[in-house]
UniProtKB/Swiss-Prot annotation:
Biological process annotations from GO: cilium assembly; cytoskeleton-dependent cytokinesis; protein localization; smoothened signaling pathway
Positions of region (G3 motif): 100-103
Protein name according to UniProt: Septin-2B
Signal peptide residue numbers: none
Amino acid sequence: MSKQQAQFTNPETPGYVGFANLPNQVHRKSVRKGFEFTLMVVGESGLGKSTLINSLFLTDLYPERVVPGAANKIERTVEIEASTVEIEERGVKLRLTVVDTPGYGDAMNCVDCFKPIISYVDNQFERYLHDESGLNRRHIVDNRVHCCFYFISPFGHGLKPLDVEFMKALHNKVNIVPVIAKADTLTLRERERLKRRVLDEIEERGIKIYHLPDAESDEDEDFKEQTRLLKASIPFTVVGSNQLIEAKGKKVRGRLYPWGVVEVENPEHNDFLKLRTMLITHMQDLQEVTQDLHYENFRSERLKKGGASKVENVEVTKDQMLQEKEAELRRMQEMIARMQAQMQIQSQSGDV
């Protein structure tokens, strides 16, 4: 066997074509390209949303944030703040966008306070639909909201009317994951009681939250057990902290109280690790549900109404359209020139 032949055959496995290597090709391409994910966090002020997000991704997304005083909250309106950070771990890049909603639920009158949030979600669908219909489809940035952590106060006896209204208004647009904040303010018994109450109310009100898919039959038993535990933990009761404290002779992230220490990453203390595991292991599924269900529903409605409407805050100028068309024209001209050069070479070799 020649050296060149050996490079393209596998003598150890006769009849092997190579299709089994296709997943590796997809993996390498995905790693080179990197991943995009958009997470929205919604909930009243003071529930530790920013702290939890910083704890989840070991980063500081809000270094310059100023917390408004009580007087400023009375007439405060909902703002939309999107922060993007590039995270790299073992050669894998993640472009994470966290959409925060300061002002939600703070004002005395909270009627329609969630409408700016719904407008933002719809606007990202509009952007994506517009980009899909454009010339430069290869380089579409996906800013659609793939998941929404909805923070529920631990101080009530279940869902507030605003919680119900918001989730029902958004559940056909975004994957909602309910989170009970500040779990360290509850005893274990109170925690379980509140979880059951929230789940019962979600079912009674017909609210559609994100349901983890069942593990496949060919998955290993550890993964099946992990999936079962994650499903049983919804809604997740969490504690966030960026402070390192000493517990049992080691440094851990947690909160120090006169009665003891609450460790953020201790599954016996709260569901922080389960929430992070759910997000990481089901990130692809969250994106697929967004694409195949929520976005397709939005797209179908838009097409029924006669195509994409105007996108808020996005001005497609004539100059931009001309630049796109000129770039496309240049690519076509270059392709034609290459084809002509190849034909000329073939013609010359034929004459010889």
